């Protein structure tokens, strides 16, 4: 098929400015799980692809070129900056232009790979063909062997999605909003079924490919890094309980690698969108990520963390601490005898430290100094554990007492950023940071009051 996308008169740098800026609200990009090495013939490898592919507030260079194929779109989603009715500068890359940019940035060590999304130009199938053509050129003509993550466009022809899957490391289909009702109200052109269909196709393709790789060692990989999705949080009235249940269902039914949560930012000014006087709900986004981690790695279920009577996460305590203080009948846990499943539910004990505890206690009984060396955060764990039947200090196993002590340090909103999780570092601006961000400013940013 001929790809009738003209370069036009717009300079490439202007296109890059427009289309990197337009891509900054899509957070569903990561390269974890891909370990393809260089083959000596191609350019790039994915050995170092587990690093954080995001943008920092201190001016550090991003390692993933995150751009849109085009910000033209036939849809008119109320929350989207690139909606059809929005008056913004428009631009479209050709596949060759994206390949050129990717290779030039890679050779200069600016990036580790490519994250390519797109508005819908013409129709979904044509847009997916452009994405597929771009990646095919990168892999075959330019011999690029680095990490590539692209979008699967809902409504695109299944055979084009299939072809794309054999060329990329990860694919994602954005769920957009947690429920079908929210999607109908803010994105009337989109339908839940058309979003879930490519998710199911990718899941099936990965499973079939996994079996093929058992039989044929050199079989080509299909979406080797798995698939992910993204939900916008705060644009519609769903509770945290609804959102985390949707995420759990996606993990169970579609074998997703990641669900990303994006705090809603009103970039269109549409009057039907909620007003956010305190700014984007960044603390809520943070709590959802913490709960998501508990679902994926700690053996928790959504119904254990929240229910219809308690539909929102605690502002002051992280989800694991909140669960623990509500289930004090299960504590204290004896470190030297508790199974791994119980250790993982103790605040201050992570996956790695729980594994180290299980391994270390085979050689003898563990003490509190041993736990500190292992990596346990004792200032949180001490209320919930004993070593050889003794607690670290004589503390009360009472909910009010523990909550008071856990929330004493107000700077425990653990972002590690200034709250601007939705902002992308410009590839061109010379940003000057006149002073470091203070602890108070971090707290204000976390709760949307900065």
PLM region descriptions:
Residues 99, 122-305:
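Conserved AdoMet/S-adenosylmethionine-binding subsite of the radical SAM
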Residues 1-72, 377, 385, 393-450:
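Flexible, acidic/Gly-rich N-terminal and inter-domain linker regions that tether
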Residues 272-344, 380-429:
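Long, highly charged, low-complexity intrinsically disordered interaction regions
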Residues 103-119, 291:
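Short Fe-S-cluster ligation motifs
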Residues 67-96:
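Canonical Radical SAM [4Fe-4S] cluster-binding loop centered on the CxxxCxxC motif
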Residues 64, 77, 116, 173, ...:
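Conserved, mostly hydrophobic/aromatic
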Residues 65-67, 96-107, 214-215:
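Short, charged beta->alpha transition segments
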């Amino acid at each position: 098929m001929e790809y009738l996308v003209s370069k036009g008169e717009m300079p490439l740098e202007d296109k890059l400015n427009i289309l990197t800026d337009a891509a900054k609200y899509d957070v569903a990009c990561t390269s974890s799980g891909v370990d393809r090495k260089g083959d000596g013939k191609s350019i790039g490898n994915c050995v170092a692809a587990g690093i954080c592919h995001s943008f920092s507030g201190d001016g550090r260079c991003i390692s993933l070129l995150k751009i849109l194929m085009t910000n033209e779109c036939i849809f008119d989603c109320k929350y989207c900056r690139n909606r059809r009715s929005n008056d913004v500068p428009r631009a479209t890359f050709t596949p060759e232009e994206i390949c050129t940019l990717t290779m030039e940035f890679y050779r200069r060590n600016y990036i580790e790979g490519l994250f390519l999304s797109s508005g819908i130009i013409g129709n979904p199938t044509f847009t997916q063909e452009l994405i597929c053509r771009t990646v095919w050129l990168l892999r075959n003509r330019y011999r690029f062997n680095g990490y590539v993550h692209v979008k699967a466009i809902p409504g695109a022809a299944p055979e084009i999605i299939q072809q794309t899957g054999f060329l990329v490391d990860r694919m994602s289909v954005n769920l957009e909003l947690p429920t079908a009702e929210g999607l109908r109200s803010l994105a009337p052109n989109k339908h839940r079924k058309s979003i879930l269909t490519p998710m199911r196709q990718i899941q099936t393709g990965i499973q079939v490919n996994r079996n093929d790789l058992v039989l044929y060692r050199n079989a080509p990989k299909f979406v080797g890094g798995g698939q992910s999705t993204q939900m916008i949080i705060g644009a519609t009235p769903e509770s945290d309980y609804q959102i985390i249940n949707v995420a759990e269902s996606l993990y169970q039914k579609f074998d997703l690698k990641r669900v990303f949560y994006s705090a809603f930012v009103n970039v269109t000014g549409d009057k039907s969108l909620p007003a956010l006087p305190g700014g984007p709900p960044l603390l809520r986004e943070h709590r959802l990520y913490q709960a998501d981690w508990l679902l994926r790695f700690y053996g928790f279920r959504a119904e254990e963390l929240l229910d219809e009577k308690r539909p929102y996460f605690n502002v002051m305590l992280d989800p694991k601490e909140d669960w623990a203080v509500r289930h004090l009948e299960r504590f204290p846990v004896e470190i030297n005898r508790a199974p791994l499943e119980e250790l993982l539910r103790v605040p201050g004990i992570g996956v790695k430290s729980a594994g180290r505890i299980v391994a270390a206690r085979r050689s003898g009984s563990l003490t509190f100094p041993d736990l500190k060396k292992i990596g346990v955060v004792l200032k949180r764990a001490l209320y919930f554990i004993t070593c050889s039947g003794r607690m670290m200090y004589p503390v009360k196993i009472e909910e009010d007492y523990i909550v008071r002590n856990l929330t004493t340090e107000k700077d425990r909103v653990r972002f590690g950023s200034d709250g601007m999780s939705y902002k992308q570092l410009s590839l061109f601006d010379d940003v000057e940071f006149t002073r470091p961000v203070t602890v108070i400013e971090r707290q204000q940013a976390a709760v949307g009051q900065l």
